[in-house]
Amino acid sequence: MNFSMEVCGMYVPFRASLLPFGGEHIFPKEENLRLFLENNKTIGIYAYPVEQIAAEHLLPIVKQLELLQDMEHYQKLYEILSKYPLEGRKVQESLGALCRKDHVKCSALVWESLSGYGTYTYMEKKWKSLLRKVKKKEPAWQEVHGLICRFLEPIWEKLMEDQIFFGDWMPQLGRFLD
């Protein structure tokens, strides 16, 4: 939805998205935004945790593998991993719950398949098709796939071993801090 608001006699456009949420037992957290043009007045907004959103994009990726038709899951996940710090434990808990609910087995075979897609021309063609659709030229498929694999590998290993993962994702570094 596109909105505009008037601040100091100027109209400021902004966009808000409302996405359906299919998860359970997830509560929005409050975030405060500072309005610089309004004497640093703050407003509160409620948003679902970015860890849950990341897990919801990971589920179709690990469930459907190369049969995934909607490459937007890769795009959205790449955007999240590039911008937001994440708590690995929360992503692991959310992804584990979603996998159990959808009967997705956390196995080495799934990881081997997924990790090999960096050089898989079929997936690269699907990625380039998405980029044309959204009128972008980058990032390259190998960059997107590499970032997602660096993020998912330690989480997936702990899911397979039924252990808890402790690590904080740092988007500036493109890796976890353990």
Residue map of PLM features:
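Structured mid-to-C-terminal alpha-helical surface segments
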Residues: 1-178
